[in-house]
């Protein structure tokens, strides 16, 4: 190892030395030789040293076998990092010119990779950290893109380049629209070497490298590449890179980071470096007071879009949650506007769906990585994370395209946006791609999960933020809890439109009924409809409208038609498209029609219901000559044919008629003639060739049948008289019910006035080859006939409860003499002079406040007509009269008196129910006294009063009771607190009212309405075994009354079959729960459940009488012989009860519970429990 002479270079003596031999196998000998050669190299570090090392590398590489020189070069960089560029640059030159091909196991690359991953902890040192930093710094500096086309390069060079980097992913340098993108392929030949070094290095080296390379950390100075300084900034355990770095690293760093991470994915199919790079880019690094000035802050995010896309495609929700919260909680020195950065990150991920190839984001990435983290942060209630998450949610909701992408950004599908008139096809085009539908479904499910998974307080706060983001609540409102930065810098709310709301329909499908979240989305829907109507029918004065009509009639008509298309598209989608289920679409169409009526009333300056106007017009026209009638009709059409209600009606008319025509044509085209149900139904699946396109015809007829079933189901649901539980612009009182009745009355009036609709519906009733269409059309036909007068009378006569509260004094004394004569019932005439003292309507009057005295009719004259007008001036008087204490009971004439009063003022029946219902809820529990029974006192007396009102006006009063019960009835959930006990008491009283109404068989109208409320009856009998007999007994009483109501209903003949259907379905659903009550500890419950089962079994022996001559259409449209005897008659109740008894016995035995009560009940019912099944 002696020094060479002046005439001989020092590298010439190495040609025959052990440096070029394979390394010794003995570890210690190998280490000693390496150290010796490193010290020898250090003796010649002069100006000529870089050239000598370059010549040595060019002559000795490539090499197929491992030699000691490999380790010596790597170790020399470790001991002399300031001369590292002299060793590494020749190797880089060989890689670039293709003379040396990179491989992880090739020489000398393997030695440099092993250098950054020491075999022992003792090898970690300050010197080692400087060497690693120098190697990565030099490789990064020279890892610049090389553009070469296949036409300019030879086969050898192309082969070398393809082996030098196997990453096929494009970098950020070429533009997306560059014409030379396919010809010029940028290659970074040093990326594989850098990625292998980073994969072998500790985590600290990787994070510091990405921060340094992206410009986050380091001191950037202009000038040449300078050697590292001796000073160190970190400890040996946590090495950090060099602070002296040229300015070019900021511009070149993004391309290097992308290339290095892409190379790992391409060669190893792993993303370890990506998982380290993204947090290093987004989160502030740990710093001290000595080096915090070296932190440059959050880098620009756009160059790393592809990296973020890959990271969020593979990261776990917990990791992305830490990342998002860390970014939001970052100090201002790191991210002056962390909210903008987080929103930009979402924008980049959403936009990446257009161009990203390979790994794709999961369908629910928005929920997994953002919405879930936002919900968890907001559940913290206080702190920086909660406020920042709320502000981020506000930003995201203010830009709806971030939640649900526009049509052109769904899975890269190119869909051209139509102008204003292209609304009808947008949703259809979108769902043609299954991936797009899956993305929308997953995102909607994620939004619903965020709303409902963190408690009611968080749900309420999210709802208020959503409404504020959409401009429904002012930001300075006390109801909105937003950070000050959002209130100080408000954003422009999005323009409400049907396209904007379409994805929210999926969210509504996942939200629980009656939740605050559903109320929020329904409120947004109401605002959307109102916005669409304001665009379609802008409020204008008649003078301005006339002036515009004269000046630019053609232009205004074209604009109006374009604006009208959005309204029609919304109605069309809800009626026929699959964007929402039938139940949800029915509720939304209820809102659409009510908002249309409200908008039309406000525009015309009149708030009179549409049905009242129509009925008034009809009455006037009926008494006028034909010419005047035609003139009135023409004027009416001119006035009403331009509003939103007319647009709604025109769509219903066109859709029903078109579908009816198409469906009725099918049997003719299929073969004609009269078909049986099975024959024609079987031909639906057979392709019919028309003009050579059998597939298109088959799809068309299937679509027509599906659309017909859907629109009939929705129209039938609009007759249910159920108000929309949330989102309507009406008040909490009876106006909701008036609105529901108004919708049903409007649909009924539309069908009755239109001969085309009536004819189309009759044609659909004849489509017996499709049972559902036939059944629904027949049911709709009967509903129009049965309910039209009932709902119209409610709309025309009923007034809101607030009107009576405003017009009636708090306390009023009135003494009136009534002279009432019974008609056709009593021979004698009885006169009642009644003194009535009315007190406050908000409380139950104490005993003694009302005095009712009977007098003879002497001297009374004829005050009956005047008495009816003066007595009981409002609903409060009538409600107090009905609930007054009477020791002698409810005298026989009161029922007739009540009918007379309600006949004179029919609007009272509806409002009296509202007042009595409030009394029912607020009345205290009163124990029986010696003078009177409990049935005549307290809330039970209110139940009696409600039944009397229903008996007097069964149709309207029963509908009002059902709707009030649907609104007030709460889930049967066991709660020990005071609020839970109050809820139980209210439910018990409601069920008691339903029981008494079900027992009243004298009024078929009320029984029909109650039986049709199947959802209410199921809710009233739900949770029979949740608590003790306090709730179980009223529910069993309702089932008993239901079972006993079947026999009198069957006596009505065919018209009662549909009612029996609803009652039997309730009994069928609650049969298992009734069987379980047979083992209840309470003897009263066991006896009552046995009575219920006995009444159910008796129904099997009741013959169903059917008149020989049937009407054209029957209830629910089932006039075929098979339906005439109804499903209830075909139910083998005894067999069903027997099976339930067996199952209950097995269940009790499996839980080691006694079965003696069950055996006793089975013997009483005549059943035998078999345990062999």
UniProtKB/Swiss-Prot annotation:
InterPro entries: GIGANTEA. The keyword Cell membrane does not apply. Residues 162-172, 613-633 have a biased composition (Polar residues). The keyword Heme does not apply. This is Protein GIGANTEA. Keywords: Biological rhythms, Cytoplasm, Developmental protein, Differentiation, Flowering, Nucleus, Phytochrome signaling pathway. Interacts with SPY. Interacts with ADO1 (via N-terminus) and ADO2. Interacts with ADO3 (via N-terminus). Interacts (via N-terminus) with CDF1. Interacts (via N-terminus) with TCP4. Induction: Expressed with a circadian rhythm with the highest level 10 hours into the light and the lowest level at dawn. The peak of expression in long days is slightly lower, shifted later and the decrease is slower. Residues 150-187, 604-641, 840-863 are annotated as: Disordered. Widely expressed with highest levels in inflorescence apices, young flowers and young siliques. One of its GO terms (cellular component) is cytoplasm. GO terms for biological process: cell differentiation; circadian rhythm; flower development; positive regulation of long-day photoperiodism, flowering; red, far-red light phototransduction; regulation of circadian rhythm; regulation of DNA-templated transcription; response to blue light. Belongs to the GIGANTEA family. It comes from Arabidopsis thaliana. Involved in regulation of circadian rhythm and photoperiodic flowering. May play a role in maintenance of circadian amplitude and period length. Is involved in phytochrome B signaling. Stabilizes ADO3 and the circadian photoreceptor ADO1/ZTL. Regulates 'CONSTANS' (CO) in the long-day flowering pathway by modulating the ADO3-dependent protein stability of CDF1 and CDF2, but is not essential to activate CO transcription. Regulates, via the microRNA miR172, a CO-independent pathway that promotes photoperiodic flowering by inducing 'FLOWERING LOCUS T'. It is found in: Nucleus; Cytoplasm. Residues 854-863 have a biased composition (Basic and acidic residues).
């Amino acid at each position: 190892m002696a020094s060479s002479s002046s005439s001989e270079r020092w590298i010439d003596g190495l040609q025959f030395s052990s440096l070029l031999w394979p390394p010794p196998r003995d570890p210690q000998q190998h280490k000693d030789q390496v150290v010796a050669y490193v010290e020898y190299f250090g003796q010649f570090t002069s100006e000529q040293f870089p050239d000598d090392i370059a010549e040595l590398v060019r002559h000795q590489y490539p090499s197929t076998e491992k030699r000691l020189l490999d380790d010596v070069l790597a170790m020399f960089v470790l001991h002399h990092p300031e001369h590292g560029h002299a060793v590494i640059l020749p190797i880089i030159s060989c890689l670039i010119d293709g003379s040396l091909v990179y491989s992880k196991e090739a020489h000398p690359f393997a030695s440099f990779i092993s250098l950054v991953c020491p075999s022992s902890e003792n090898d970690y040192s300050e010197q080692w950290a400087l060497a690693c930093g120098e190697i990565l710094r030099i490789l990064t500096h020279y890892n610049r893109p090389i553009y070469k086309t296949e036409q300019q390069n030879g086969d050898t060079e192309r082969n070398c380049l393809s082996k030098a980097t196997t990453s096929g992913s494009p970098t950020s340098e070429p533009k997306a629209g560059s014409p030379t993108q396919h010809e010029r392929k940028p290659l970074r030949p040093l990326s594989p070497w850098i990625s292998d070094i980073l994969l072998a290095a500790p985590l600290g080296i990787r994070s510091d490298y990405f921060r340094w390379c992206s410009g986050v950390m380091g001191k950037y100075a202009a000038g040449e590449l300078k050697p590292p300084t001796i000073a160190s900034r970190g400890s040996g355990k946590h090495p950090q890179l060099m602070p002296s770095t040229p300015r070019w690293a900021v511009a070149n760093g993004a391309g290097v980071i992308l290339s290095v991470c892409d190379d790992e994915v391409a060669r190893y199919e792993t993303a370890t470096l990506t998982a380290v790079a993204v947090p290093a880019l987004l989160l502030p690094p740990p710093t001290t007071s000595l080096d915090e000035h070296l932190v440059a802050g959050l880098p620009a995010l756009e160059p790393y879009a592809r990296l973020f896309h890959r990271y969020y495609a593979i990261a776990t929700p917990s990791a992305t949650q830490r990342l998002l919260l860390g970014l939001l909680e970052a100090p201002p020195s790191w991210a002056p506007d962390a909210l903008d950065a987080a929103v930009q990150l979402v924008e980049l991920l959403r936009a990446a769906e257009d161009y990203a190839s390979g790994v794709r984001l999961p369908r629910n990435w928005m929920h997994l990585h953002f919405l879930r983290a936002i919900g968890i942060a907001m559940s913290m209630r206080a702190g920086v994370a909660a406020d920042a998450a709320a502000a981020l949610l506000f930003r995201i909701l203010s830009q709806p395209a971030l939640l649900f992408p526009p049509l052109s950004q769904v899975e890269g599908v190119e869909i051209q946006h139509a102008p204003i008139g292209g609304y009808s096809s947008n949703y259809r085009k979108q769902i043609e791609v299954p991936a797009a539908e899956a993305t929308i479904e997953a995102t909607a499910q994620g939004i619903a999960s965020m709303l409902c998974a963190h408690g009611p307080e968080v749900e309420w706060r999210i709802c208020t933020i959503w409404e504020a983001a959409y401009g429904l609540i002012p930001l300075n409102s006390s109801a909105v809890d937003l950070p000050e930065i959002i209130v100080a810098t408000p954003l422009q709310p999005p323009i409400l439109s049907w396209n904007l709301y379409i994805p929210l329909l999926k969210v509504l499908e996942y939200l629980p009924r009656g939740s605050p979240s559903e109320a929020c989305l329904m409120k947004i829907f109401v605002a959307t409809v109102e916005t669409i109507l304001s665009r379609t029918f802008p409020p204008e004065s008649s003078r301005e409208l006339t002036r515009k009509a004269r000046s630019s009639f053609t232009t205004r008509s074209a604009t109006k038609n374009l604006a009208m298309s959005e309204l029609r598209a919304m109605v069309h989608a809800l009626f026929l498209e699959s964007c929402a289920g039938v139940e949800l679409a029915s509720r939304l169409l209820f809102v659409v029609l009510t908002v249309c009526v409200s908008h039309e009333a406000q525009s015309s300056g009149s708030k009179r219901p549409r049905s009242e106007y129509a009925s008034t017009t009809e009455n006037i026209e009926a008494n006028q000559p034909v010419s005047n009638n035609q003139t009135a009709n023409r004027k009416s059409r001119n006035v009403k044919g331009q509003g939103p209600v007319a647009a709604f009606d025109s769509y219903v008319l066109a859709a029903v008629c078109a579908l009816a025509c198409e469906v009725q044509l099918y049997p003719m085209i299929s073969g004609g003639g009269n078909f049986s149900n099975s024959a024609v139904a079987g031909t639906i699946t057979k392709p019919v060739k028309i003009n050579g396109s059998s597939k298109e015809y088959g799809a068309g007829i299937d679509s027509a049948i599906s659309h017909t079933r859907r629109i009939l189901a929705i129209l039938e649901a609009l007759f249910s008289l159920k108000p929309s539980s949330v989102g309507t612009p009406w008040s909490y009182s009876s106006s909701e019910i008036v609105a529901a009745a108004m919708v049903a009355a409007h649909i009924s009036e539309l069908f009755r006035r239109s001969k085309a609709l009536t004819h189309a519906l009759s044609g659909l009733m004849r489509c017996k080859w499709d049972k559902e269409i036939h059944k629904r059309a027949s049911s709709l036909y009967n509903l129009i006939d049965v309910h039209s007068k009932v709902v119209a009378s409610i709309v025309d006569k009923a007034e809101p409860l607030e009107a009576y509260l405003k017009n009636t004094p708090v306390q009023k004394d009135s003494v009136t003499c009534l002279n009432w004569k019974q008609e056709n019932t009593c021979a004698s005439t009885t006169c009642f002079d009644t003194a009535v003292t009315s007190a406050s309507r908000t409380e139950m009057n104490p005993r003694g406040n009302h005095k009712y005295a009977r007098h003879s009719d002497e001297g009374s004259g004829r005050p009956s007509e005047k008495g009816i007008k003066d007595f009981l001036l409002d609903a409060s008087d009538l409600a107090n009269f009905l609930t007054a204490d009477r020791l002698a009971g409810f005298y026989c004439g009161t029922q007739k008196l009540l009918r007379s009063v309600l006949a004179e003022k029919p609007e009272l029946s509806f409002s009296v129910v509202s007042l009595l219902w409030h009394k029912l809820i607020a009345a205290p529990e009163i124990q029986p006294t010696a003078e009177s029974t409990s049935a005549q006192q307290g809330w039970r007396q209110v139940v009696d009063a409600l039944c009397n009102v229903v008996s007097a006006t069964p149709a309207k009063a029963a509908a009002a009771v059902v709707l009030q019960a649907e609104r007030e009835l709460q889930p049967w959930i066991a709660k020990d607190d005071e609020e839970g006990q109050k809820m139980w008491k209210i439910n018990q009283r409601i069920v008691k009212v339903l029981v008494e109404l079900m027992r009243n068989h004298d009024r078929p109208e009320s029984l029909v309405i109650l039986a049709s409320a199947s959802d209410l009856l199921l809710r009233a009998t739900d949770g029979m075994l949740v608590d003790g007999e306090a709730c179980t007994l009223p529910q069993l009483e309702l089932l008993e009354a239901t079972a006993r109501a079947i026999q009198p209903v069957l006596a009505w003949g065919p018209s009662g079959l549909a009612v029996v259907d609803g009652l039997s379905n309730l009994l069928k659903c609650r049969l298992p729960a009734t069987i379980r009550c047979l083992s209840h500890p309470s003897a009263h419950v066991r006896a009552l459940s046995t009575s219920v089962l006995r009444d159910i079994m008796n129904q099997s022996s009741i013959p169903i009488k059917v008149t020989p001559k049937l009407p054209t259409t029957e209830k629910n449209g089932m006039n075929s012989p098979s339906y005439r005897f109804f499903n209830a008659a075909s139910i083998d109740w005894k067999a069903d009860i027997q099976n339930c008894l067996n199952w209950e016995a097995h269940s009790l035995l499996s839980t080691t519970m006694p079965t003696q009560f069950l055996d006793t009940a089975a013997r009483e019912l005549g059943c035998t429990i078999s345990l062999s099944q």
